[in-house]
Swiss-Prot record:
Residues 30-693 are extracellular. The gene is PCDHGC5. This is Protocadherin gamma-C5. It is a single-pass type I membrane protein. InterPro entries: Cadherin-like_dom, Cadherin-like_sf, Cadherin_C, Cadherin_CBD, Cadherin_CS, Cadherin_N, Protocadherin/Cadherin-CA. It holds the Pfam family Cadherin. GO terms for cellular component: plasma membrane. It comes from Homo sapiens. Its main location: membrane. Glycans are attached at N265, N443, N547. Residues 820-853 have a biased composition (Polar residues).
Length: 944
């Protein structure tokens, strides 16, 4: 077994020709092997991989395989070794019949590249059949008048084997009357004849028994026998004869049933019954022939009985005989050879040998994606087949020997066309031509060549504040024209930050469907808008991605009630405001100031009086500004204390509200005698006699207290030397500082606006270690003004004395928020006659050393004048009115700042970085003295 090579050429071209022929055989796929029939399954036929020159390491990648299931019926091909082996026992006789050559075509397909190799396996005959006769016994009638040398044809033995394994010769049992003669027919088969060697004598022996043996040429030889009984008849010495022993006739396939093939004509010179002939098929006529043809015994006409198919058999052989009616009857024989003519009655067939399905859309142009075989069972021009492909497809057909290749002719795009319906048309060259269609569906597999794309470049979402976490904001959607994993999208939040925190801590996106949820509860007052970057990524390899922007707008909700800035919410602990009974209608009493942290309509504030007020008809409140004014003139029977309750309501839905309570004390002072803020700031106060008396008294007492002041001064100096500048509670005179000191100072003026100006404090905080604190006190009941030079402030201990802008210092030397500011000292009021000046009328023991430096005094008055004149200006934007010195809050209802400084009643000088403090300690809360001008000095308790 093994591949057969072509004849070798001589000379120096021998090697070159052999290599060329081998290469041609591999390219065209021609290999030939042989195997003996009836070989056991697993018998090696040949190694295809070795004969093709394939390496063992390439077998797995080349995927060596049989081309069709029909080949796999008889043979198997090992993918690991490339060995072609017998799959089941092969019976040559049932496969090829009496044909001398039995070839089985086998198709082998390899991949990478895709190739088709044609292999022919010759099935070698095995002497596995013995010769056999049609019948085990035959009776022959021979007339006694038969002459010596007469020949009588015997039945030939049939042996399905071929070649040397078929019938080789015959032998006859020994007999004195008969001998055996063997002739060779045209097809090479031996034909036995019984020869009469001597005259028969019926009276001597009426019956002769002969044994005919047929022996084949196999090794070992096989044989078969039949018993011949010769009956000697009376004379009928002429046998029928045909005009020719072999007759040849042709008939087209598909001839209609009943078609006359030919009419036999035999002659017998005898007369009577010995010359009357009957026709019949000979014993060697096969059953298949008997089914296709019929013989009329009387006329000898042969007609078609069944379908004649050229593809089934191209040749038929009919054995006919003519028998007379003599006694004994004699017969003659002839052979009719029938040639079947081809008709184009078979459409061509397209057989799919291999198909790469699906095909990657990235497959290069010219790649083989399928192999096809075509065949037509007709012959000649009727069997010539051409294969065409449907137009307008990115594929083409390339013919090769015995097969066609399907190649790509254009680039493929799955997103444009996911599959192709390919129709292959096979046509033969017959007339008329026959066609056969083969339709295949070729799928195009996806490659990740498309990035996902969001449906919108910008998404906008709105959410009300205070919504619980998990609230749905919106849904982002992206699409990917790819399929499978290449189109499976995953959404995520790209790592940007919002207010210094990761964006993922604010929102969460469902990675599968793109729904975006809130991660937390949003507060409009803290955050109005988020800018989020949402990304999407497919699951291809490598993955592709895209981004989009999401703007989340937080909508305001009316969740903040108005906050009252003035008057203070803790009105029960606040000092009441003074209102003279002589105030005319429309006089400004106070101004209620409130803010709302919400926005828009939710922050629009309106003011109204509540019935809880003591005298609701006495006062009016402006709906939009919050100004409280007298509605009528004050009467004598009006209560001395009035409580005005103002309702502050926002414009939200539902509306929220707060209340402000203003305490008023009605006084009998003449408004003409009430001091105005501009009076004591612009005109220097006139010294009354009472003030002069006080100065003289203080000068007298000062000598007695000199020792005490000296001791206190030494103690203060010692405290400054120890670095505790803020711990001493003494006041001393300070030399005039340099001009640079005031350039570096940050003055802070605090004015109380609860009806009348009661006290002012100025704090200078230079960058050096010393600070100065001045305070002036005015009382409506006194004719003088008290000015106290409190103490120097040291900044060496910031934890004790350095005050931040948002805090004030209490008497207990602790810091507190401005919202906790203590009420002003009610004793610090001034009378009509009292005016501030460059020197006070208070006792030096109570107020400390008064600044006598002209520069210090002028600077202090300038700062007081600048602040007080703005507060007293009736046309100021802050508002103004009698009795209030025109002071009002800086923020009205129209402002919606989120963090409004809770300055309460304080007014600040721009540029100051500190809050005015009462460094001297707790204010004196006692009521002022009577009209005799005597009042309790605040400086006394400050020096305890």
């Amino acid at each position: 077994m093994g591949p057969k090579t072509l004849p070798q050429l001589a000379g120096k071209w021998q090697v070159l020709c052999m290599l060329s022929l081998c290469c041609w055989g591999w390219v065209s796929g021609q290999l030939r092997y042989s195997v003996v029939e009836e070989s056991e399954p697993g018998t090696l036929v040949g190694n295809v991989a070795q004969d093709l020159g394939l390496k063992m390491t390439d077998l797995l990648s080349r995927r060596l395989q049989l081309g069709s299931e029909e080949n796999g019926r008889y043979f198997s091909l090992s993918l690991m070794s490339g060995a072609l082996a017998v799959n089941q026992k092969i019976d040559r006789e049932s496969l090829c019949g009496a044909s001398t050559s039995c070839l089985l075509p086998v198709q082998v397909v390899t991949e990478h590249p895709l190739e088709l190799i044609r292999v022919e396996v010759e099935i070698l005959d095995l002497n596995d059949n013995s010769p056999s006769f049609a019948t085990p016994e035959r009776e022959m009638r021979i007339s006694e008048s038969a002459a010596s040398g007469a020949r009588f044809p015997l039945d030939s033995a049939q042996d399905p084997d071929v070649g040397t394994n078929t019938v080789s010769f015959y032998t006859l049992s020994p007999n004195s009357h008969f001998s055996l003669n063997v002739k060779t027919l045209k097809d090479g088969k031996p034909f036995p004849e019984l020869v009469l060697e001597q005259q028969l004598d019926r009276e001597a022996q009426a019956r002769h028994q002969l044994v005919l043996t047929a022996v084949d040429g196999g090794t070992p030889a096989r044989s078969g026998t039949t018993l011949i009984s010769v009956i000697v008849l009376d004379i009928n010495d002429n046998a029928p004869t045909f005009q020719s022993s072999v007759l040849r006739v042709g008939i087209p396939e598909n001839a209609p049933i009943g078609t006359l093939l030919l009419r036999l004509n035999a002659t017998d010179p005898d007369e009577g019954t010995n010359g009357q002939l009957d026709y019949s098929f000979g014993d060697h006529t096969s059953e298949a022939v008997r089914n296709l043809f019929g013989l009329d015994p009387s006329s000898g006409a042969i007609h078609v009985l069944g379908p004649i198919d050229f593809e089934e058999s191209r040749f038929y052989e009919i054995h006919a005989r003519a028998r007379d009616q003599g006694q004994p009857a004699m017969e003659g024989h002839c052979v009719i050879q029938v040639d079947v003519g081809d008709v184009n009655d078979n459409a061509p067939e397209v057989l799919l040998a291999s198909l790469a399905n699906p095909v990657l859309e990235s497959t290069p142009v010219g790649t083989v994606v399928g192999l096809f075989n075509v065949r037509d069972r007709d012959s000649g021009r009727n069997g010539e087949v051409s294969l065409d492909i449907s137009p307008d497809l990115p594929f083409q057909i390339k013919p090769s020997e015995n097969h066609y290749s399907l190649l790509t002719s254009q680039p493929l795009d799955r997103e444009a066309t996911s599959h192709y319906i390919i129709e292959l048309l096979a046509s033969d060259a017959g007339s008329p031509s026959l066609h056969k269609h083969l339709t295949i569906r070729l799928n195009i597999s996806d490659v990740n060549d498309n990035a996902p794309r969001f449906n919108q470049q910008l998404y906008t979402a709105y959410i009300l504040e205070n919504r619980p976490p998990g609230s749905l904001l919106c849904t982002v959607a992206a699409s990917d024209p790819d399929t499978g994993d290449n189109a499976r999208l995953t959404y995520s939040i790209v790592g940007n930050q919002v207010q210094g925190a990761p964006a993922s801590s604010f929102v969460y996106v469902n990675p599968e469907d793109g729904r975006i949820f809130a991660q937390r509860t949003f507060d409009y007052e803290l955050l109005q808008m988020l800018q989020i970057v949402v990304g999407v990524r497919d699951s291809g390899s490598p993955p592709l991605h895209a981004n989009t922007s999401l703007h989340v707008f937080v909508l305001d909700e009316n969740d903040n009630a108005p906050a009252v800035l003035h008057p203070r919410p803790d009105w029960e602990h606040s000092a009441p405001q003074r209102l003279p009974r002589s105030a005319p209608p429309g006089s400004l009493v106070t101004k209620v100031t409130a803010v709302d942290a919400d926005a828009g309509h939710n922050a629009w504030l309106s003011y109204s009086l509540l019935p809880q007020s003591t005298a609701p008809g006495l006062f009016l409140v402006s709906t939009h500004t919050g100004e409280v004014r007298t509605a009528r003139a004050l009467l004598e029977d009006d209560s001395d204390t009035q409580q005005v309750v103002v309702l502050v309501r926002d414009n939200g839905d539902p509306s929220l509200s707060s209340t402000a309570t203003v305490l008023l004390v009605l006084e009998d002072e003449d408004p003409e005698e009430m001091p105005k803020s501009s009076d004591f700031l612009i005109h220097p106060p006139e010294r009354s006699d009472l003030t002069l008396y006080l100065i003289v008294a203080l000068a007298t007492v000062s000598l007695l207290s000199l020792v005490t002041f000296t001791f206190l001064s030494a103690k203060c100096l010692q405290g400054n030397a120890d670095g505790d500048g803020g711990g001493g509670q003494c006041c001393r005179r300070q030399d005039s500082p340099s001009p640079d000191f005031y350039k570096q100072s940050s003055p802070n003026l605090q004015v109380s606006s609860d009806g009348t100006l009661k006290y002012m404090e100025v704090t200078l905080r230079p960058t050096d270690s010393q600070s100065h604190c001045y305070r002036t006190c005015f009382s409506p009941a006194s004719d003088g003004s008290d000015f106290t030079f409190l103490r120097p402030l040291s900044v060496q201990q910031p934890t004790a004395l350095a005050l931040e802008p948002d805090a004030i210092r209490s008497r207990s030397n602790t810091l507190r928020e401005r919202s906790q500011q203590a009420p002003p000292n009610t004793d610090w009021r001034f009378s009509q006659a009292q005016r501030p000046g460059t020197s006070g009328s208070q006792n030096g023991d109570d107020t400390g050393t008064w600044p006598n430096n002209q520069f210090d005094t002028e600077m202090l008055q300038a700062m007081i004048l600048a602040s007080a004149s703005e507060a007293a200006d009736g046309s100021s934007t802050l508002g103004g009115g009698a009795g209030t010195m025109g002071l009002s809050a800086r923020y009205g209802p129209q402002f919606t700042l989120q963090h409004v400084p809770d300055y309460r009643q304080n007014v600040y000088i721009p540029g100051s970085n500190a809050t005015l403090t009462n460094a001297a300690g707790k204010r004196d809360g006692k009521a002022p003295a009577g009209g005799n001008g005597n009042k309790k000095k605040s400086g006394k308790k400050e020096k305890k």
